[in-house]
Amino acid sequence: MNTAIQAALDHAVQTLQQEGVLPSDWNNSSNLTRTKDRSHGDFASNIAMIGSKAAGMKPRDLAEKILAALPEVADISKAEIAGPGFINFFLNADQRFAILDQIQAQKESFGRSQSNAAKKIQVEFVSANPTSSLHVGHGRGAAYGMTVANLLEATGAKVDREYYVNDAGRQMDILATSTYLRYLELLGQNLVFPKNAYQGDYVKEIAQGIIDKDGDAYVREVANVYKDVPEDVQYAEELDSEGNKVVLSGDKEKHIDGLIANSQQLLGEGYRVFHQAALHAILDDIKDDLADFGVTFNQWFSEASLSAKIDEALETLDQRGFLYEKDGNIWFKSTEFGDEKDRVVKRRNGQTTYFASDIAYHLNKLQRGYTDLVDIWGSDHHGYISRVKAAIDAMGYDSKKLTVLLVQFVSLWRGGEMVQMSSRSGQFVTLRDLRKEVGNDAARFYYVMRKSEQHIDFDLDLAVSQSKDNAVYYIQYAHARICRMLEKAASTGLQFEVSAARSHAARLSLDAETEILAKLAAYPDVVLRAANAYEPHQVGNYLKELAALFHGWYNEHKVLSDDAELTQARLLLSINVQQVLRNGLELLGVSAPEAM
């Protein structure tokens, strides 16, 4: 319906341009939206307020001219001017009921469209280092990324979901060396485990797996492993005035780097055994965790596979004049593209930087023919956006193809108090822990109920409560309530048939019923707006509002009554609410239970 109204408004604009009321080059950037207040009609346009300056007249005066030039629109009973110059459109009664036919015809497809059918989009998300289990912060990125991808698919886009596996960096070497040191410990070697190594028990489990398979084949003298390694950091017993540790001596970074170098030299090819065992153990754990959370990927892309692409990317930048040498390092001229400073891409020792890998990865993405790239990063990567976009432009591509969405941190609350997010050893509360406590549905829902760049205070008590204050429970309960109502109707021998019930739709004459019909009709627009804005919370809020309308109506008015025609009409309305709730919950990755 909004398409027909918008076409009529466009026609009116063309007429007024021909008459000289509006400039011929005026671009109509107005919005046509569904009204929130039923007294204001079904749709409202701000076109007169947008165009008033160009027309040189007051918005209400322009609105009158637009109405005069507006062609007749089928199923619109009237259009009127309101407030400072809004144009409100009122649907006739038959058109309001048409949404019931549309939902029943489209079922699971209702709300889906082909609006973004021309787009091939890659959504890269989570991409956590495979060095430990996913924590609750990663969980938010997982839920958000999966739901954004779902929404884009629902609007017709071809979407690939990708996880970038950081399997070639220093953190993996720290994990591999941590595993080797635990391996030596488990085989009776005495050593002081480094403070900057990975401390979790899972490292011992990986090491034990290597022992079970290969025994003591990789044992080397501990003295040689620690030979010429700089001293590990030593801390004072007391914290400083700000609660931070006070360094007395040593350097934890140089210490672990020395252990990595010695382990690699002593083990030779055997070092890869520890590297790969640790990588696969953690990556398998991450894959299982995400799959259990309903988050899946088309591609798990290995950073280690990028070596040739790094050379290609740097050669491209060099040929285009955007690399230079200084102090033995190779630098990228990112300041020429608005970055705050130039960036090193290759160090004097010949090692390329993580940034060089990221440039190569985005070159690889662009060469795969995507129309749009969506990267979902943690908020701490904010400063990284400008340099990546600079590299894309410098290689001759359009950085506007890349959208970077930042995901803020998550705080957990229980009993009105913030939950300690990490232990003394630095182990964060895991996604698996959260899912075990509140369930997948609550986690998936509450993770996306705020804009991604906004901090989330996750109330664990609320997430498991059975009350209307718990939005996901309230929505699911509306769906289950309708299922129970239909079962009750069937148990009494009531014969419900959609086409017959449709003939009695005019009995849905209450304001509450008209409001529900309007809310149902708004769903496709909500999905499209949420997809284009990368804002899943719009769908979540819509479902909350629809559930509230249904519960309020159900509590005040009997659906199953002695009035057969009214019963049929209200059952028809209910099953349409049920369908839309189910469709919306599916996009959010939340179940629609039939009983609660």
From Swiss-Prot:
Keywords: Aminoacyl-tRNA synthetase, ATP-binding, Cytoplasm, Ligase, Nucleotide-binding, Protein biosynthesis
EC number: 6.1.1.19
Cell location: Cytoplasm
Keyword Transmembrane helix attributed: no
Reactions mediated catalytically: tRNA(Arg) + L-arginine + ATP = L-arginyl-tRNA(Arg) + AMP + diphosphate
GO MF, one annotated term: ATP binding
Gene Ontology process terms (BP): arginyl-tRNA aminoacylation
Enzyme class: ligase
One Gene Ontology cellular component: cytoplasm
Domain of life: Bacteria
Motif ('HIGH' region): 128-138
InterPro entries xref list: Arg-tRNA-ligase, Arg-tRNA-synth_N, Arg-tRNA-synth_N_sf, ArgRS_core, DALR_anticod-bd, Rossmann-like_a/b/a_fold, tRNAsynth_Ia_anticodon-bd
Record text on subunit structure and interactions: Monomer.
PANTHER family per UniProt: ARGININE--TRNA LIGASE, CYTOPLASMIC, ARGINYL-TRNA SYNTHETASE
Protein name as catalogued: Arginine--tRNA ligase
